[in-house]
Amino acid sequence: HLFMNLKIFSPLFLLFLFITFPTFAQKHVPVSQAEIKLSFAPLVKKVAPAVVNIFTRKTVTQRAFSPLFDDPFFRRFFGDSLRNSPQSRKKVQNSLGSGVIVKSDGIIITNHHVIKGAEEITVVLSDRREFDAKVIGSDKRTDLAILKINELKGKLPFLSLRDSDDLEVGDLVLAIGNPFGVGQTVTSGIVSALARTQVGINDLNFFIQTDAAINPGNSGGALVSLDGKLVGINSAIYSKGGGSVGIGFAIPTNMVRTVLTSLASGGRVVRPWIGAEGQGVTSDIAASINMKRPIGVLINRIYPKGPFDRAGIKVGDVIIGVDKHDVNDSESLRFRIITQPIGDSLSIRFIRRGKKQSVTFRIEAPPEKPIINKTELNGFNPLQGVLIGNLSPALADQIGKSLFLHGVIILKIRQGSPAQRFGFQRYDIIKKLNGSEVRGIKQLQSLLSKKPDQWVITINRSGKILSMTVKR
């Protein structure tokens, strides 16, 4: 009977521990079905009013080509000129998403892709009130945008931002949004993983992974912890069919806070830089540099007189941590840097020739030299109609390019211009013109003014070197 008595005694003993030692009770594992019966209703009533539905309208242009454009007879006489003059028609496109009120005066956080190109934005509150809203700022690289409700009278409920570094795998969370436009919906789940990188969602990859159901329309909605605070902005799902399969991703609030601080005042996001590039240490790399296991980021390029260079970091060093946080890939390293205020100091832990070392460096903004000097090219040349600028580390960071690139970059191309017809694209970097290396805008203008019989233009397009030959 001893075994039976122990079975009866155990729950009573555990209950005694929970009452007597509250700290023990905070982390206990439920021992019965009754203990895990709980309701999120009080929490939902508290946080749901701060989550809004967002409806956008924009005019899109559709190009339609006549089948005659591909007829050999017409192509014999007109070449590709007909195909380069598309018939266009416009239509209004409606989209939906979600957002989170983070200030009582109507400041809302959502995803950049929710409001991209929107001409009209309508925000619908949980009490069905509707407001027009405007974009205060947007950051494509983090897929975050800040909205402001127009003509707001009174104050609105809002969510405070929690330190997302306090989250642990297994924590319960709620996802709130407007999936498929059916109306505000709440789902629950746990934090499945932290610091998810290389998931191909946007340029700056560093996500909270959750199994709380996230579906189309949830984008921009809230991921909320059980203390009623915002821990992430729901951004994307991993799905082959478009519906939730239990793998959702949210942008952590530490990233959100950085963008909010920069954009809320109408400015632009200025991200700190380290003046270096590296790659995650693989098993092969670890073996080649006599490391016991593959950890950290191997530095393979250092920008002269940049922050890492001045701090004494060298090519071949392996960065293993920033302050108290470990890093194992370049995305994690970048996240730990860019979520800190410019002007602060950070401790970098690294391995050099098998020995662990640390150094402190000051966080800085990337330099804006050379000056961008935006210029539109005109005249009789194949680049007519492009807006160009000098490429600097600051500009490279804004558009997600390597800080080691230099030269003249195409920022915009006028619709129907010769440059568009010749196939130039936004963010092409002009490297050479007729064999001469292009180092700046003035030099490029001088080379274009010579009017040769033909132009041979070498460009860097997303890392690929291409050459275009255009005859006069």
List each model region and its residues:
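Glycine-rich phosphate/pyrophosphate-binding loop
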Residues: 395-400
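Low-complexity, intrinsically disordered Gly/Pro/Thr-rich segments
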Residues: 440-458, 464-465
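Acidic- and glycine-rich mobile interface elements
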Residues: 298-303, 323, 404-421, 428-437
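Conserved catalytic motifs of ABC-family nucleotide-binding domains
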Residues: 316, 427
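Short, low-complexity, Pro/Ser/Thr/Gly-rich segments in the mature regions of secreted, periplasmic
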Residues: 463-471
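Bacterial N-terminal signal peptides
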Residues: 11-20
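Serine-dependent protease modules
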Residues: 25-315, 321-347, 351-384, 389-394, ...
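Bacterial N-terminal signal peptides that target proteins for export
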Residues: 2-12
